[in-house]
Amino acid sequence: MSEPLDLNQLAHKIKQWGLELGFQQVGITDTDLSESEPKLQAWLDKQYHGEMDWMARHGMLRARPHELLPGTLRVISVRMNYLPANAAFASTLKNPKLGYVSRYALGRDYHKLLRNRLKKLGEMIQQHCVSLNFRPFVDSAPILERPLAEKAGLGWTGKHSLILNREAGSFFFLGELLVDIPLPVDQPVEEGCGKCVACMTICPTGAIVEPYTVDARRCISYLTIELEGAIPEELRPLMGNRIYGCDDCQLICPWNRYSQLTTEDDFSPRKPLHAPELIELFAWSEEKFLKVTEGSAIRRIGHLRWLRNIAVALGNAPWDETILAALESRKGEHPLLDEHIAWAIAQQIERRNACIVEVQLPKKQRLVRVIEKGLPRDA
């Protein structure tokens, strides 16, 4: 063990070590989330968590870090940028024949990377303590990471419920290290949303039902990632070409003009997932899906839900015979997929018929003009 440091020195060192490990910011807070408990309970009571039963099952444990690791006195909260240099947001979203994957999922799964870095941070702290118990968390345990990040001074909660930072926007991952030493804590920052409601207005499905409250049952991220069954039919047309997650509420946010690019190679987009053709994705076998998504967050939804999401996007695409053929080719593989294929085919046929009407109408209008030209002026 190295020479023990006093707690103020240690807190300073922890932030320095965190930066050296690749985190963009490190903050420290206590474990008191009592103010968040009523909000969490109200959210659960309204069933806004949808089918994410684990949220209700863990209940208030999420707001009590000291119960996750008995003896915990402080939470070290960290953030790491994930925005790649070639994100290509607009070009992908504007092309309905391409599949849009939320930019956090284009590269390697962040859970393992952040957890390993947090573990290293814990081991570095351990070298300067007589004794230390620690436990890293990365979006994988019942813990309210955003309120903790807010208390630790990493940013404020935006109306889309994500953490916003004045120098970095919101395109970053969060992680926590629970420790049992009474480090000095950081102070929250002032919120900066003001009267802006851009995120609420832009949400394709109206999932941000009131400021700071998201009804997950309407959120495209929930529908494409967490929901195991059929996507509600009334929401399918609103999903566009978003096949895994959604970034709209972040893209519209004025604070994301200050977003910083990631320095992690692991977060660079994988070519098969970056602006891919929907028809090509829909042709993937399960073997191909597992190969391409190895080490990716996408893999956890499985091949079936992947195809379900793409079927919806194909249904939202402009009429194309090749799309219709692609949809027909996967009929009969699974009832869940069949339901979404049938819907998508109906959408495609409806657009084809609309195209026929649009073509016929100008021809009729031209014929009327020709006849009118041949008539006497006083006819």
UniProtKB/Swiss-Prot annotation:
Its EC number is 1.17.99.6. Binds 2 [4Fe-4S] clusters per monomer. One of its GO terms (molecular function) is epoxyqueuosine reductase activity. It is an enzyme of class 1 (oxidoreductase). [4Fe-4S] cluster 1 binds at residues 193, 196, 199, 253. It is found in: Cytoplasm. It catalyses: epoxyqueuosine(34) in tRNA + AH2 = queuosine(34) in tRNA + A + H2O. [4Fe-4S] cluster 2 binds at residues 203, 219, 246, 249. Its cofactor is cob(II)alamin; [4Fe-4S] cluster. The active site is at residue 139. Pathway: tRNA modification; tRNA-queuosine biosynthesis. HAMAP family: QueG (MF_00916). Monomer. NCBIfam families: tRNA epoxyqueuosine(34) reductase QueG (TIGR00276). PANTHER family: EPOXYQUEUOSINE REDUCTASE. Belongs to the QueG family. This is Epoxyqueuosine reductase. It comes from Shigella dysenteriae serotype 1 (strain Sd197). The gene is queG.
